[in-house]
């Protein structure tokens, strides 16, 4: 018998024990209508199952199915019920173990499928980068060959009395006003808290692509799609130089990094960079929430 049939027989024995004077037909009828059954069953089928189980248990005795029984027969019924209950519990335990093994197997298959999808996506991205690189390098190499084939034009020396024009140097940032001791302490406290936080984001398992500026050779169209590039290394330098001194300002700039990732790579859940950006974004929010909560408690 399967578990559902064993439960039906066990339910019959329970109802028989609770109603020792009820006729068998009523017991079979009440058992068939019980809400505790695992699946519907007809009275005739139930009767056959009860007789079959008693026969298999070497307890086949018509008196056990009737209500005219002695105390010894009642004890026999109780023993039968106990044995059947143990069988049901054993079968249920085995069924549960089987289900758990199936679930573990399914989880492993899902994890492998996800890993394979990420691996395939990375392979596609790498192939796409190689194709773009080859497409970009081909005309550049042709142009270089053309230039090398031309005759060099002699350089024209500048007159001795005219100094050559010096290319303008990079503008130096304006000197910041001298900070008071209180402002210096506040800035130092801000730096000691925020720089390690940015390091934690960089050290995240998916944080490497966001730790430095995007390589324009690998993404030549990046500036045409992203209005204001940003990266964690640049933010660390801005903090060290005192150009960012507020938590909210830093938070906005960090979010800009992941917004740029979405802008350039799209929101396709199968895109590896999109997945990495989402993971780092959630991790960043957790870090800033922890910092804000700690700051609130310390006030």
From Swiss-Prot:
The keyword Transcription applies. It holds the Pfam family Bromodomain. One of its GO terms (biological process) is DNA repair-dependent chromatin remodeling. Coiled coil: none annotated. The keyword Secreted does not apply. InterPro entries: Bromodomain, Bromodomain-like_sf. Keywords: Activator, Bromodomain, Chromatin regulator, DNA damage, Nucleus, Transcription, Transcription regulation. Residues 63-73 have a biased composition (Polar residues). GO terms for cellular component: NuA4 histone acetyltransferase complex; nucleus. It comes from the Eukaryota. Residues 54-79, 130-152 are annotated as: Disordered. It is found in: Nucleus. Residues 182-298 form the Bromo domain. PANTHER family: BROMODOMAIN-CONTAINING PROTEIN 8 (PTHR15398), BROMODOMAIN-CONTAINING PROTEIN 8 ISOFORM X1 (PTHR15398:SF4). Component of the NuA4 histone acetyltransferase complex. Component of the NuA4 histone acetyltransferase complex which is involved in transcriptional activation of selected genes principally by acetylation of nucleosomal histone H4 and H2A. The NuA4 complex is also involved in DNA repair. This is Bromodomain-containing protein 1. It comes from Schizosaccharomyces pombe (strain 972 / ATCC 24843) (Fission yeast).
């Amino acid at each position: 018998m399967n578990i559902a049939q064993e439960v039906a027989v066990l339910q019959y024995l329970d109802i028989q024990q609770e109603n020792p004077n009820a006729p068998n037909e009523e017991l079979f009828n009440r058992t068939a209508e019980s809400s505790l059954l695992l699946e519907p069953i007809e009275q005739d089928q139930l009767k056959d199952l009860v007789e079959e189980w008693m026969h298999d248990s070497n307890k086949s005795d018509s008196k056990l199915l009737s209500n005219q029984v002695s105390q010894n027969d009642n004890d026999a019924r109780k023993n039968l019920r106990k044995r059947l209950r143990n069988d049901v519990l054993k079968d249920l335990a085995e069924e549960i173990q089987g289900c758990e093994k199936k679930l573990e197997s399914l989880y492993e298959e899902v994890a492998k499928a996800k890993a394979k999808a990420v691996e395939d996506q990375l392979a596609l991205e790498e192939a796409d980068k190689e194709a773009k690189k080859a497409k970009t390098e081909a005309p550049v190499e042709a142009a270089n060959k053309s230039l090398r084939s031309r005759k060099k034009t002699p350089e024209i020396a500048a007159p001795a009395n005219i100094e050559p024009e010096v290319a303008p140097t990079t503008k130096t940032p304006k000197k910041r006003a001298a900070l008071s001791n209180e402002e210096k302490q506040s800035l130092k406290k801000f730096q000691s808290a925020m720089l390690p936080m940015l390091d934690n984001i960089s050290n995240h398992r998916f944080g490497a692509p966001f730790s430095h500026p995007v390589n324009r050779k690998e993404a030549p169209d990046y500036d045409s799609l992203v209005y204001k590039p940003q990266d964690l290394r640049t933010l660390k330098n801005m903090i060290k130089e005192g150009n960012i001194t507020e938590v909210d300002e830093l938070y906005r700039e960090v979010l800009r990094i992941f917004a740029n990732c979405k802008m350039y790579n799209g929101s396709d859940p199968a895109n590896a960079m999109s997945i990495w950006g989402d993971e780092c974004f959630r991790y960043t929010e957790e870090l800033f929430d922890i910092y804000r909560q700690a700051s609130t408690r310390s006030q």
